[in-house]
């Protein structure tokens, strides 16, 4: 009987710039894979935000982190993929048959913005729901913007990102790519 009720896979999209991907993002990804059958980590090109890392670099960093999650057994390869997008989020969700948008919330200020976005998205495509996941206590204050600022000023970011991401930040800032932080 359960097999008869089984519909097509529930696809979720976790969008972001991931500039860079942080431990907070990874926490949301791990938890989101428990909610949906297939999670697409959607890396926004979003040149308007002036990213430190190019889109292909951000996609590569996220893919590398997903490989680690898979290796650790936190998820499996069939449940997650990483794609870049540069169009309206709702159009992207429609193109991948997603029915859920995953968003992480750290603070009340996040909620206000995300609440407005969820309302706009619901108007654009009422069949796609937005699901909010509260940041874990240890991750509540992590933001990519703060990580870049700390890294740019020579601070230790190892409590906020994985070692490979920290190394990429160090390389960027050693080359003088500081204008975007």
Predicted feature locations:
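Nucleotidyltransferase catalytic core that binds NTPs
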Residues: 1-181
